[in-house]
Amino acid sequence: MNVSDNYRFDGNLEPGNRLLIYAYGHWVTLDNLLSFDFIEITVRGSRLSIPDLYSFIRHWRAGGSPRLKFLRLEFDHQLDFEHFEDELEVVERDIAGEYRSRDDHFQNWRFDHGYCIQRNDGVKTVIDFGGGHFVMMNWSEIQLK
């Protein structure tokens, strides 16, 4: 199924365990991401920007998306993450490990240079990013190397 470049989703999705958008994820906006209520989210073909990611992190830090344990965005373009960590208020860096989904085949993500950030209520997440991806994983759900 091909989704038009002009497509916009302004509805609400019911809360769920997993949201998979394997292709044509360009329609997912920051507002959509802020309203999703899922434990694990994967979006491929994302067109979100660095400022969008900062906004999502601020939302998460303030207690938003409380059920989210795993977020994976794969971009349809390269993002410049050169100074990205400068805005993160990093608690710990160069974390290596693996996230394993409770459904063994849903999402596994290995990382070697993760950044740990902390929410206002003390919950921690590890962020891994590069030109083509951005991943957030709940600290309690990862296995450290």
Per-region residue spans from a language model:
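Non-core capping and flanking segments associated with repeat-based/extracellular domains
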Residues: 1-145
